[in-house]
Amino acid sequence: MTDKRKDGSGKLLYCSFCGKSQHEVRKLIAGPSVYICDECVDLCNDIIREEIKEVAPHRERSALPTPHEIRRHLDDYVIGQEQAKKVLAVAVYNHYKRLRNGDSSNGIELGKSNILLIGPTGSGKTLLAETLARFLDVPFTMADATTLTEAGYVGEDVENIIQKLLQKCDYDVQKAQRGIVYIDEIDKISRKSDNPSITRDVSGEGVQQALLKLIEGTIAAVPPQGGRKHPQQEFLQVDTSKILFICGGAFAGLDKVIEQRTDTGRGIGFNATVKGSAEKATEGELLSHVEPGDLIKFGLIPEFIGRLPVVATLRELSEDALIQILREPKNALTKQYQALFNLEGVELEFRDEALTAIAKKAMVRKTGARGLRSIVEAALLETMYDLPSLESVDKVVIDESVIAGHSEPLLIYGKHETQQASGE
């Protein structure tokens, strides 16, 4: 097509769509025996844009994974915690279904379901949240509740959480409003006593109060591109009612609170029922019976608990589960180190007894899955230090004695020469 004012005969030209002459428009574009003006081009673009907006939600609805699909994906990366996965899958599915139907269905407003994860250190709380965000392809950010303070005090303002989320998606507000925020160590902002204090608790109850509106849903004013706030500045307006908040914490001591409530057999004197150690419920079993009243007694304020209606509890990982974590997930720790050694052209083998020894060590340390990496890293440190300087190494073997610190990894050379790594 070409831009024309007159045809070769000097005849006045008109737009074939709106009928305006070439003198009434800025541009007239010629096609085979037809003309279109710049105004009609703009109008066509507007029509197409509107239609794309209408079609997009229908495409998104069909692409929303079901709870079963979400659960299956979590199974690929997270070992155990079956009940927590099910709770998360349903809550996340309902949240994004609400967003894609405009927050209401047949005039009924759909409430927001934020999530509270309760479980010991290293049980998979953070990994579950990260895996969900990656699977759903939505922006994800983490915040540490212990660094947060009320606005006006030294520390991190709660609205900085939204700023971090915006940074993850290049300050695209629409993308950020579909994101997931994980707030860790939420148990550390419990108030210091059951009774409301007349003094300010800026890092405990004060932070809970500051988080209330953010989690429930408010329009957060965030400075563009991470600048500081000042009165003359234009702010980005972010609707937090569309953001899914997942709060997690170990809640050490919460099991004792639940035990006090559920222990109906307590008594004094000769008729008292005394439970043996075998009859006592485990921490994981007790946490699965958590109720809002227990969390209030622990130190969370009722209004804050009300904003986290979906509660999922995670159990402490067993030795068998830790061995599975080392071996089975798509990004299992042993697979990561094997890939690292493959970059050097070396095969890395973990014997079964080595995996058992790693799991036992993590159980003793009570660090859960989080402590596995440090154990493996310590066992492989000397080998990873020496390996780039060694030639003809085909294979490195890790057995139980290496994990126990009694020997160095076994190096197998190309000419079938075998020796212990340096240090022996």
Swiss-Prot record:
Keywords per UniProt: ATP-binding, Chaperone, Metal-binding, Nucleotide-binding, Zinc
Pfam families referenced in this protein's UniProt entry, alphabetically: AAA_2, ClpB_D2-small, zf-C4_ClpX
GO biological process, one term: proteolysis involved in protein catabolic process
InterPro entries assigned to the protein according to its UniProt record, in alphabetical order: AAA+_ATPase (IPR003593), ATP-dep_Clp_protease_ClpX (IPR050052), ATPase_AAA_core (IPR003959), Clp_ATPase_C (IPR019489), Clp_protease_ATP-bd_su_ClpX (IPR004487), ClpX_bact (IPR046425), P-loop_NTPase (IPR027417), Znf_CppX_C4 (IPR010603)
Cellular component terms (Gene Ontology): HslUV protease complex
Binding-site list for ATP: 120-127
GO molecular function: ATP binding; ATP hydrolysis activity; ATP-dependent protein folding chaperone; protein dimerization activity; unfolded protein binding; zinc ion binding
SMART domains: AAA, ClpB_D2-small, zf-C4_ClpX
SUPFAM superfamilies associated with the record: Glucocorticoid receptor-like (DNA-binding domain) (SSF57716), P-loop containing nucleoside triphosphate hydrolases (SSF52540)
Chain positions recorded as Zn(2+) binding sites: 15, 18, 37, 40
Signal peptide: none
ClpX-type ZB domain location: 2-56
Coiled-coil segments on the chain, per record: none
Family from the record: Belongs to the ClpX chaperone family.
Annotated function: ATP-dependent specificity component of the Clp protease. It directs the protease to specific substrates. Can perform chaperone functions in the absence of ClpP.
Subunit structure as annotated in this protein's UniProt entry: Component of the ClpX-ClpP complex. Forms a hexameric ring that, in the presence of ATP, binds to fourteen ClpP subunits assembled into a disk-like structure with a central cavity, resembling the structure of eukaryotic proteasomes.
Protein name: ATP-dependent Clp protease ATP-binding subunit ClpX
Organism of provenance: Pectobacterium atrosepticum (strain SCRI 1043 / ATCC BAA-672) (Erwinia carotovora subsp. atroseptica)
Gene encoding the protein: clpX
